[in-house]
Structure formats: structure tokens, C-alpha cells
């Protein structure tokens, strides 16, 4: 044995004898021989029972964003039995923000795909695959017993014919004189009791079958003309008395409600009274959750201002002559970043206990995609030039629409901008994206005639290109006065592009 250590041996055989994976064999073999071992040594690689084969490396569903709770396996990029190296792309995972590639962290062979591609709603930490060391029998690898199966997942299935819609039809019942079939308004009940009339002798015309005061007055008129007579209730059949429950004893008289067909029922598309369920993606569910939380927990305040784009459009035309293509939205991003630098009190967030001033100026730009609204980030926007901002917006927008955004490209941000001007919207209000404190909603620029004065003081009409911007702010950290001053400074910066240099 001493000679074998001195003369050397097959590294793979050495690994099998000691019981450690090859990539970790150097440090761990030293520990087995009594040499110093760092505290970070991973002792899970000792195998007392399977000393001729190492345990497989588990591939777990990772957390790829702060808000991610589950993910979908879009596609496996490696097949079972295929060799992988650290850094190789294993599969594509759809998170709550984008489709992200999961890379291998170890060398070896992909032995088993536990969760097939197309599986959805896989919880974080669930086992999705196994990797074994090179040279091991990957075909007979077993799923570790200490890892249970992942929670139920929804896999793509063949469309099944929807059941025929079932519509409830009121069943005609024999009416017992003296009983009420309608819900009565208080005024109608008083009139009927006063004149000893029964609502069943008339017709309910109120919404959802309510017998109204007007319906009761019609019955009184019919009684006065002799067309109907007083209603005398027929004694109900004798029933064995039972002790009423406390709830029944305190409850007032109840009247049966009219049977109303359901507004919609699951069924075949285009059928009357049916609907089609639309599966929600992870992105759509997270957007719905976060927007609901924002509107219900963040006190929104709004401030609006009109900005003259005359100078911006002139600068933009000059840049086009030099083959520099930038949009009005790029100027808006730059103006917002410069204003945040001038007013750091607005560059804040709410962390649950109090305000927190942010040391960076990262602008989140809303981008519409097929899967929902995403907000890639223009980092350090105040230090970037207009052309740099334009290039960043184009690149990030394309990645967002292709579902290729990296987590660091959409996580964070200190201020958001949402522009619907390209859709012909004049103005709107946007929902704050927590923990950010503000979002700026931008409408389209439109021609407006304004009365101005020339150099000689003569009044004249001039056409101006105006846009309306509305800032939604978190009143807990940005009050109305601060929001107003911010918009005033933003307007001045945008209307004078030289300030953005």
C-alpha cells in the first residue's frame, strides 16, 4: 500500500478506495491520511455503505430571483447519459421574471432527469435531476431516499373535450297560498301586510327578483277594483316541534330566493354561458400578486405636469443628422436620473420599517412582453450619456421580449418609468413597484396651441409639443410637497436638454 501511494495509482481507483468524488479528492484524501483539512471540507462525500460508488450530485430547483417561489422547466439542454462540465447549460427555467439558463456546478454525467421538461409550478428546493461522476454506472443511479418526490406538478396534457354546460333551470313548484316566493323590499312588505295581500298575486319587477313598493301598490289598485281578493294564509302541515338552535331563535323570517341561472359555467368555447380558463404563467401570477399588494399597502399620491418637448425634439433632429438615433423616452430617462441626483430625498425606498436612501440611481423601464410587463434596469443612468441610455434600452428591451433577461438585469432599481405614449395615450397613472417609492407615467406628445409673446412683447399663437407626466409616489417617504418640487425640477431639466449634459 505504501508503495502504491508513493508510486501513484489511477486517480479514479484512488477515489473509489477512499470514497470521494474526483474533483474533491485532493483535499479530502489529505484528511484521510491525517493531513490538515480545512473547515470547509464537505464531509457528505464519506460513504460507509457505498464505498465503491459516490452519491449522486443533486440538482435542485434554485431561487433565481428574490420573489421566486416556484419555477417551470421549459427545456432540458442535456440528455441522460450525456457528459457535463462545470458551467455547461443544463436546462432552461422560467422564473417569475424571465427564462433563465441553469448551469452545472460540477463535472460528471447527467444520470437522471427527475422532472421532465414542460413541468410547471416546481417548488424551490425540489429535486429535478441527478449528476454522477465520470466512470460511474449512471444507468442504475437511484433517487436518494432522503429526497421525496416534488410536489404535484402540472404537465402538458392533450386537450380534453369540455363537458356540456349545465345551466340551472327553475323547477316549477306548486305554490301554497299565503307564502311568499319573492324577496320583499321593506316598503312593499308594509303595504302588503296592511292590505292583507300576498306578493304571489303580483309580479316582481325589481332587480334580481325583488318585489318593490311599486309592485305592492299595483296589487292594492287591483284589490280596489275587485280583480283580486285578500289572501288568507293556509295553515302549514303540523310538524313535530324541535328545539330551535340559538342561531335560528335570533334569526328573522327567511324567504326563498328565486333561482337564477349562473352567469357563466365551464364548457365549450363560444357556447352561451360558458368561459375558457386561461393558464397563468409564473410572470403573470407574480405581477398580479405584487400589484395587488402595492395598491392595498402603499398609500399612492399623484402629481401631474405638462412638459414642452420643443428643445428635446430639436436636439433629437440634430443627432439624427450625425446618425445618432435616440428616442424621446431616452431623454425622459436621463432627465429623471439627473433630477434624482439633484434631489436624493426622492431616490429612496421603504423597507418595511422606515425610509432608506439609495446610493445608486438605477432606472427601471417598463417593457411590454407577451408574458406581461417587465422592468429591466438602466444602471447608473445619471452617469450615462443619451446614446448610452438608448443602446441599453434597446438591448434590454429585446432581451425582455425574448425572455433572456438575467436576474441582475431586472432586480432592484430605485425609480420606474412607464411610457404609453406610443399607444396614443394622453395621460395615465401607474402603480408603484415596491420597494421603490415612485413611478413616472408618460403619455404621448401632442401639438397644442399656446399664446406667447415675441421679443417685442406682441402676443401670438404658437404650436407646442407637450407631454403629460404623472408621478405616483409613496406618501410614507415622498410627501406631496417633495413630489411637486421633483416634478418642477424634472420639467425644467427636460425642457432644457443642455442641463442633461
Curated annotation (Swiss-Prot):
Residues 183-220 form the Peripheral subunit-binding (PSBD) domain. Residues 1-53 form a transit peptide. The modification Phosphoserine is found at residue 196. Residues 147-164, 255-264 have a biased composition (Pro residues). The modification N6-succinyllysine is found at residue 394. Pfam families: 2-oxoacid_dh, Biotin_lipoyl, E3_binding. Residues 237-251 have a biased composition (Low complexity). One of its GO terms (molecular function) is acyltransferase activity. The modification N6-lipoyllysine is found at residue 97. It is found in: Mitochondrion matrix. GO terms for biological process: pyruvate decarboxylation to acetyl-CoA. Required for anchoring dihydrolipoamide dehydrogenase (E3) to the dihydrolipoamide transacetylase (E2) core of the pyruvate dehydrogenase complexes of eukaryotes. This specific binding is essential for a functional PDH complex. Belongs to the 2-oxoacid dehydrogenase family. This is Pyruvate dehydrogenase protein X component, mitochondrial. It comes from Homo sapiens.
Amino acid at each position: 500500500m505504501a508503495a502504491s501511494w508513493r508510486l501513484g495509482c489511477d486517480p479514479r481507483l484512488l477515489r473509489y478506495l477512499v470514497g470521494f468524488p474526483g474533483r474533491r479528492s485532493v483535499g479530502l484524501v489529505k484528511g484521510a491520511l491525517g493531513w490538515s483539512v480545512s473547515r470547509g471540507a464537505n464531509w457528505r462525500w464519506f460513504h460507509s455503505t457505498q464505498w465503491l460508488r459516490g452519491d449522486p450530485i443533486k440538482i435542485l430547483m434554485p431561487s433565481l430571483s428574490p420573489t421566486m417561489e416556484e419555477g417551470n422547466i421549459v427545456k432540458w439542454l442535456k440528455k441522460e447519459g450525456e457528459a457535463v462540465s462545470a458551467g455547461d447549460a443544463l436546462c432552461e427555467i422560467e422564473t417569475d421574471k424571465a427564462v433563465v439558463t441553469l448551469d452545472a456546478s460540477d463535472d460528471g454525467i447527467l444520470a437522471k432527469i427527475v422532472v421532465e421538461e414542460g413541468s410547471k409550478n416546481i417548488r424551490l428546493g425540489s429535486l429535478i435531476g441527478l449528476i454522477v461522476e465520470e466512470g460511474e454506472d449512471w444507468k442504475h443511479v437511484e433517487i436518494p431516499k432522503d429526497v421525496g418526490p416534488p410536489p404535484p406538478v402540472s404537465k402538458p396534457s392533450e386537450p380534453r373535450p369540455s363537458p356540456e354546460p349545465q345551466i340551472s333551470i327553475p323547477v316549477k313548484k306548486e305554490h301554497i297560498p299565503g307564502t311568499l316566493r319573492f324577496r320583499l323590499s321593506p316598503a312593499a312588505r308594509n303595504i302588503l301586510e296592511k292590505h292583507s295581500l300576498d306578493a304571489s298575486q303580483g309580479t316582481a319587477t325589481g332587480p334580481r327578483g325583488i318585489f318593490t313598493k311599486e309592485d305592492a301598490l299595483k296589487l292594492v289598485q287591483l284589490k280596489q277594483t275587485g280583480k283580486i281578493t285578500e289572501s288568507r294564509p293556509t295553515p302549514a302541515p303540523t310538524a313535530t316541534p324541535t328545539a330551535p338552535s340559538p342561531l335560528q331563535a335570533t334569526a328573522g323570517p327567511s324567504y326563498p330566493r328565486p333561482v337564477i341561472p349562473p352567469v357563466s359555467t365551464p364548457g365549450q368555447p363560444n357556447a352561451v354561458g360558458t368561459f375558457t380558463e386561461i393558464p397563468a404563467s409564473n410572470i403573470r401570477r407574480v405581477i398580479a400578486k405584487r400589484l395587488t399588494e402595492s395598491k392595498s399597502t402603499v398609500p399612492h399620491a399623484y402629481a401631474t405636469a405638462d412638459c414642452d418637448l420643443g428643445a428635446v425634439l430639436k436636439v433629437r433632429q440634430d443627432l439624427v443628422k450625425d446618425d445618432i438615433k435616440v428616442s424621446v423616452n431616452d431623454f425622459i430617462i436621463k432627465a429623471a436620473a439627473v433630477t434624482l441626483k439633484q434631489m436624493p430625498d426622492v431616490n429612496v425606498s421603504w423597507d418595511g420599517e422606515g425610509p432608506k436612501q439609495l446610493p445608486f440611481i438605477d432606472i427601471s423601464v417598463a417593457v411590454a412582453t407577451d408574458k406581461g410587463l417587465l422592468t429591466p434596469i438602466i444602471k447608473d443612468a445619471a452617469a450615462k450619456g443619451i446614446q448610452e441610455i438608448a443602446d441599453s434600452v434597446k438591448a434590454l428591451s429585446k432581451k425582455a421580449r425574448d425572455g433572456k433577461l438575467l436576474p441582475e438585469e431586472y432586480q432592484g432599481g430605485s425609480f420606474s418609468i412607464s411610457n404609453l405614449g406610443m399607444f396614443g395615450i394622453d395621460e395615465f397613472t401607474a402603480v408603484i413597484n415596491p420597494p421603490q417609492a415612485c413611478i413616472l407615467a408618460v403619455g404621448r406628445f401632442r401639438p397644442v396651441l399656446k399664446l406667447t409673446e415675441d421679443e417685442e412683447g406682441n402676443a401670438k399663437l404658437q404650436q407646442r409639443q407637450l407631454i403629460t407626466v404623472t408621478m405616483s409616489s409613496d406618501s410614507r417617504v415622498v410627501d406631496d410637497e417633495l413630489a411637486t418640487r421633483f416634478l418642477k425640477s424634472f420639467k425644467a431639466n427636460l425642457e432644457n436638454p443642455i442641463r442633461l449634459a
